[in-house]
Amino acid sequence: MSDLKAQDSLRDFDVRTTFVFNDYPLRGSLVNLSQAWRDVLRPHPSWPRAAADTLGRFLAATVLMAGSLKFKGELKTQISGSGYLNMLSAVATSDGTCRGTLSVDDSMPIGPEGARDLGALVGRDTPIVIALLTDKAAPYLGVAPIEGGDAADALANYLARSEQVDSALSLAADDSRIAGLLLQKMPDAKSDEGDGAEIEAIKAMARSAMPEELLQTPAPALLRRLFGEYDLTALRQDPIVFRCSCGREKAAAGVVAMGLEGARELLDERGGIEVRCDNCLETYLFDEKDVDNLFRRPAR
């Protein structure tokens, strides 16, 4: 494996490793997040395991997909459904940060199939929405139905349908790590006619990665184990950390969105307005003076 022999220069965890196959038109990304995932989970000890693991797999996939795009901004994967897991949001930014949140409907028992079947967990008619948000252009939205039994199948189908990118994806999550491996055929790349079978074999190897392998094996060792017979070049490693995007300015915008009448009703009922971040649970307080300042019209 070409440049990957210099393993001492590659970090093992909390990074996204991007690599290419030198003899085939394939690029890949591998991510294994430990500290970042624990930071996502820390404010939410009551999240049910099946729901948290599903968020973890989608967050790993979102970090992988963000690494293959050329943009300045953030990529968001969102599900809003009618099942037990009725909301999921996973975000990765071009700056190497990630965050995620979820909500569940406790009135809908998960059932034995829910932990294994994504459709059973979120609702059969629920679509996946992928949003690319930048400060340079209007948001791009991609929508695809949930097909396949798990997050990896559903997102690979999304990439094939909405992005027309031939992909192989493996994902894993537990209460201390999340991990993922994404292989994609390079668009418009030329290859020999005989390469097709070999490319399919490589993709099958990627899909065969067991959850324990993805979660516990350092990046260089995992690439060696899966693709040791191929010539690979590691292009870069990007550190990934948890970082919430909340702040008082964003919270204030939420108060303004209520409208003056709605804000004053809350003030009358509760004596103040609390805006809580879904990701980190930071709470921002606004009193009557704050509300007056937010809705004060600029002098003419």
Please give the residue ranges for each predicted region:
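Interaction interfaces in information-processing and related assembly proteins
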Residues: S2-R236
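Cys/His-clustered metal-coordination modules, chiefly Zn-binding fingers
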Residues: A206-R300
